[in-house]
Amino acid sequence: MSNLKAIRDRIQSVKNTKKITEAMRLVASAKVRRAQEQVLATRPFADRLAGVLYGLQGRLQFEDVECPLLQQREVKKVGLVVLAGNRGLCGAYNSNIIKRAEARAAELKAEGLEYSYLLVGRKAIQHFTRRDAPISQCRDNPEKTPDPQEVSSATDEILAWFESGAVDRVELIYTKFVSLISSRPVTQTLLPLDLQGLEAQDDEVFRLTSKGGKFDVTREKVSVEPEALAQDMIFEQDPVEILNALLPLFLTNQLLRAWQESTASELAARMTAMSNASDNASDLVKTLTLSYNKARQASITQELLEVVAGA
């Protein structure tokens, strides 16, 4: 009987755990939708900003533009901005981004370049701190989806890092959101910016939809058309000053988009992990129930045999 009670308690424990994992899955799926809505809400400003910037680029393409954020230096030290999460229970999300950062650091070391980390997220901070890695700055990753104010603060730190000469190039390592079951760590150069390649960059917007009763993700390419600036347009300020004011905004937008993708990737990974955990819990309950029924049947049979033998 004690064995039957142990199995019954185990079944109840697994059922309670399944309730928790199912709740976490639903919360993560709702937050993924919120992340999508935030991407779409920031899209109009990003499109107009990029359009004006591209228009200025065309206006200044034959001029010698002096802008600190465009200045190409001899690279001796590289700053690596790593976007990770604060919590676990999200599959291999954090370990994949950490492996990518370590692999990039190994590549830079092989090239004879120094490097330093700017870490976002407690998981990355804990990992690299334990290994005495060269860390310049650390930031907590907000539990909610990133807002422009939070990202603007991070951009200011990155700009100060670059403009002070502490690093000669800044690279961003984040997780690109591909689908609800797939994401991949990528590396993107943040600074210095290269105006010659900006007009060729296409953006992407992801949308969370329902398909066949399940969540699905669609992505669409967004090409930004340059803002038409008349050649005889007279600026109240020097166009170079306008460019210097717009580039930090453009950098903030780039960082915001990457941060939103990383957040969506983490939430999707957590949703998948909790869905798998719920499925495993259901399978375990079935197995335990079968074991319970067999043990109960064996117990009843044993009692009958004892009664018959006693008679």
Swiss-Prot record:
Bilayer topology annotation: Peripheral membrane protein
Keywords: ATP synthesis, CF(1), Disulfide bond, Hydrogen ion transport, Ion transport, Membrane, Thylakoid, Transport
MF terms (GO), sorted A to Z: ATP binding; proton-transporting ATP synthase activity, rotational mechanism
Pfam families assigned to the protein according to its UniProt record, in alphabetical order: ATP-synt
Entry-linked InterPro entries: ATP_synth_F1_ATPase_gsu, ATP_synth_F1_gsu
Entry's localization field: Cellular thylakoid membrane
SUPFAM superfamilies the record matches: ATP synthase (F1-ATPase), gamma subunit
Keyword Nucleotidyltransferase in annotation: no
Location (main, coarse): membrane
Family note: Belongs to the ATPase gamma chain family.
NCBIfam families: ATPsyn_F1gamma, PRK05621.1-2
Name the record gives this protein: ATP synthase gamma chain
GN (gene name): atpG
